[in-house]
Amino acid sequence: MLWCPSVLVPLIAVAACLPVLAIGTPLEWEFAITLKSKILFVDEFWRTLASAAHEFDELSALTFDETEELIYFNDQQHRNGSIFSLRRDALMASHIAEQAIQRTGNESVGGLAYDPLNRNLFWSDTLQKKIFFASIDSKVTETPKVLVDLSQEGARPDGVAVDVCRRKLYWTNSNITHPTVESIDLAGTNRQVIIDTDIDMPRGIVVDQLSDRIFWIDDLKGVFFALKSARLDGSDRQLVLHDKHHEPLNLAVTNDAIYWTDKTTKAVWSHPKVPIVKATTTTSPLKAEEEDATETIPDIEPEPVAEVSALLRVANLSEEARGIVARTGFYQRLQKDEHCANIVRKVKERLDLMTKKKQMRSLVDEKTAQLERDHCLNGGTYIADRVLCICPTGFKGSRCEIRECHNFCVHGTCEISDRAYPKCYCQPGFSGERCEISKCSGLCLNGGHCKLEDISEKPSCECPHNFAGERCEQNSTEICALFCRLLKHEADIYVPFGCHDICEELAKDASDKIAIPQYHHLEVCMTPSPWTSNVIIVLVLGIVSCFFLVAVIVHGFRRLYKPKRPRIRKTFVVRKQARTNSSGDTPLTNRPLATEQCEITIENCCNMNICETPCFDPKLVEQTLAKSSNCKEDKKILIHNMDDDLY
């Protein structure tokens, strides 16, 4: 990112071209960014180097004086001051913030710019709709002067930028009904509207002395935004980038890139200065070649270049990113520029003159001047008759050699209070009169690790093994040892469950003093068995149910598919005395008399009480009737082989 032309003197070239600057040099930072409550300094690789201005609450715009290494910034909520200066002492790694412009009302600074030649600050007030300026050499209480009054026009001045070489001020009018980009001489004359078409809501603006162009941010309608550039007179307008979902506020330009802050993503983005699309109207190449053509060819809409846009997110921030400035080194690079060489020479002459004024003293009293120069330091007033120094605010010592803020704040920014005492504004995570106390200091005991995840919350402790509590102050080993000692004497005392292993370990060395708690079902809790009584009961019931279901199914199939045995009913008539009505009558063909015979089915033969006549085997009836039989023989032939003779 650093550019080293061959025309530079060797000392400047070495200072600017070193890739890693020595620690403590004033040129160690490349970009400064205002967040809501601090100013962030980063190097060319966007590594955070330091932060400052922690005592302020609502920072917005800022500008940078490269000649004297001063940052000028605005605080929207400070009660006394509106614009402040910040001098960063890299050798001391400290920052000194001083009030530059007093607050006059409820002003709201939109943009801030600095003229190093006349040492004037210019800023836009979005509430009063005016552009003010004031000299930093004037008294703080002096009222700022109005350069441009836009209140009657309904305009809303936003970003401002100074063209040091051509002595002009540029500003953007973000009134969406009639947005413009305008310029005026630093003397307050020759006001011009250089751009008033094809813009929606221009915000931040910057003058690039290296390319003689202006760059500005245009907050387009909807979710879109654009980065645009033009020559200093408004011609040759170019569209550098057209994108969406950003809310850009301010921008800075280096030799090869543009950087801007975005409130939506809380980040800083960059893009090359090479334009992607030409915003001016283009014509057909044929029209340029055919100069004598009578027919005009309609304008062709610009088309984007086929290359992919090199949009890059260079920094992620913890708060809203607002203002941004970059170190350009244009005083060294533009010493031979036709427009800037004269201004650079005058600035150097002014710096030399300031140095000489600091060294010059009145020749009227050479002794007093010599004493002031040698004895009283840092602007102290020498009292000759008392031979002492009256030190200015912020210094002390017999020769005013001690800066009261020097090494006073360990982790913070020092500022001299209204009572002339140093006061520290601590960085997040620190407190104390000198910001020497860390919120984590001495908090965690017994080797605990302190964590501070959120600045607004209390720090917490991560405790090692066998320690607990907010500060890791509770030793579980000692607590369990007390319980187990009491258990040795009182068997019914309750011992926490987690103490079993600890007491078991302690009992190895002092078994006579330590008792090991015996918990019910400890083994079951430690190694639980799956075969519980409930599981066994459910398993047995399931098996029995399965067997019963199988039996029912088998029986059903047997009933369904096995044929029934036919039931055959036979009736036999038994009689004791047959009638001899004819020659063909036989005992089996003639029914006996009612008193002498009995009719019975063969199935009921076993039920002997149905009739008085017993059952006889049919095959033997005829044989027995022809013979004389007795009672014993009748019993022998009763139901003889009846099952075999039914069918």
From Swiss-Prot:
Residues 365-401, 436-473 form the EGF-like domain. It holds the Pfam family Ldl_recept_b. PROSITE patterns: EGF_1, EGF_2, EGF_3, LDLRB. SUPFAM superfamilies: EGF/Laminin (SSF57196), YWTD domain (SSF63825). One of its GO terms (molecular function) is Wnt receptor activity. InterPro entries: 6-blade_b-propeller_TolB-like, Cueball_EGF_LRP_Nidogen, EGF-like_dom, LDLR_classB_rpt. It is a single-pass type I membrane protein. SMART domains: EGF (SM00181), LY (SM00135). Residues 23-534 are extracellular. GO terms for biological process: canonical Wnt signaling pathway; oogenesis; spermatogenesis. Keywords: Cell membrane, Differentiation, Disulfide bond, EGF-like domain, Glycoprotein, Membrane, Oogenesis, Repeat, Signal, Spermatogenesis, Transmembrane, Transmembrane helix. The chain crosses the membrane at residues 535-555. Glycans are attached at N80, N106, N175, N316, N475. Its main location: membrane. Belongs to the cueball family. This is Protein cueball. It comes from Drosophila pseudoobscura pseudoobscura. The lineage of its organism: Eukaryota, Metazoa, Ecdysozoa, Arthropoda, Hexapoda. The gene is cue.
